[in-house]
């Protein structure tokens, strides 16, 4: 799935957002009741689109400040959502995972739960579609919830603490794949132009400065791709142990392995998000530089890549937040320990 994400992003990073959000089905599969799984998973498999409705006007990086209200209706036998969500990618999707405040009188993360909203039930209005710098292939919406019916996913009060954390880790893998795809696209565009553009009687790829830039672009793209695949491997092994634990008790050695790969997944996911998104911006910048004045024009794809890349080190957790998340693993020696294993 991650490899496919990368290939889709190489073609169009905006469309990859719609494609990548289908991974919301994994969250439903892992945490939702059997009834909800039977209702939504076949629909998503048949082509229903997904969204994760987390951000609000006053709750961006600080999701603990989410205030969209979920109230239980005894009369209707369902939860009713009221409030506003902002900057929601693919906000008009068919199935939405919504972070909402179910506990009266709370103002922190412990009052938040995860709910699933079905577009067919109504109650949500797209008030605005953002006019964005890039990733124009997917709509980014402001949503108004007015008594929108929704169903609880998993347990109350665990929305941010457990379910969104899992969802965000998967989303950050997706942004890693998206960033690597854009790095590859930028490198290919730059390489193609350098082989075709001639100045001073020779193709510009033969100039040492251009050749060095291309070599660095290739090396960084391959390096961050390796980080993407390795991080995905850590996450996948941890998830497999989790699935096994639902079927039978794990052996002592298996529990130790599960704990180990959970630590690696937690440590390498922010590292991947940080480096891949920053490299995507750098690769897009360098691609335009190699194109010269032509790269500033909309006639060439690198102009679009440059605009698309800019959001990658912002959404699903800014680079600064990834540094904060990684610091704990630096001090605990997670990265150093793994480097020694590679050696």
Model-based region annotation:
Residues 261-294:
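Charged, glycine-rich active-site and insertion segments that engage polyanionic ligands
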Residues 1-46, 88-91, 315:
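Internal helix-loop-helix
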């Amino acid at each position: 799935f991650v490899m496919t994400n990368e290939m889709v992003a190489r073609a169009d990073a905006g469309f990859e957002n719609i494609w990548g959000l289908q991974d919301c089905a994994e969250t439903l599969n892992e945490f939702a009741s059997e009834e909800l799984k039977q209702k939504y998973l076949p629909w998503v498999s048949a082509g229903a689109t997904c969204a994760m409705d987390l951000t609000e006007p006053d709750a961006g990086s600080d999701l603990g400040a989410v205030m969209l209200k979920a109230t239980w209706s005894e009369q209707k036998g369902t939860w009713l959502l009221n409030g506003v969500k902002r900057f929601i990618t693919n906000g008009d999707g068919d199935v939405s995972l919504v972070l909402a405040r179910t506990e009266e009188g709370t103002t922190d993360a412990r009052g938040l739960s995860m709910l699933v909203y079905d577009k067919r039930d109504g109650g949500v209005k797209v008030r605005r579609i953002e006019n964005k710098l890039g990733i124009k292939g997917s709509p980014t919406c402001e949503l108004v919830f007015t008594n929108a019916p929704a169903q609880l996913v998993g347990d109350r009060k665990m929305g941010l603490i457990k379910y969104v954390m899992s969802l965000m880790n998967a989303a950050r893998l997706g942004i890693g794949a998206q960033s690597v795809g854009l790095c590859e696209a930028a490198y290919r565009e730059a390489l193609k132009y350098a082989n075709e553009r001639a100045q001073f009687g020779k193709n510009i790829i033969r100039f040492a400065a251009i050749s060095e830039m291309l070599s660095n672009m290739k090396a960084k793209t391959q390096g961050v791709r390796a980080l993407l695949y390795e991080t995905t491997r850590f996450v996948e092994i941890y998830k497999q142990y989790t699935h096994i634990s639902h079927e039978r008790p794990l052996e002592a050695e298996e529990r130790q392995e599960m704990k180990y790969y959970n630590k690696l997944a937690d440590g390498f996911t922010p590292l991947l998000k940080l480096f891949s998104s920053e490299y995507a911006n750098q690769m897009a910048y360098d691609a335009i530089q190699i194109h010269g004045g032509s790269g500033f024009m909309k006639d060439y794809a690198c102009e679009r890549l440059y605009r698309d890349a800019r959001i990658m080190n912002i959404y699903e957790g800014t680079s600064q937040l990834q540094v904060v998340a990684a610091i704990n693993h630096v001090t605990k020696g997670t990265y150093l320990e793994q480097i020694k294993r590679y050696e």
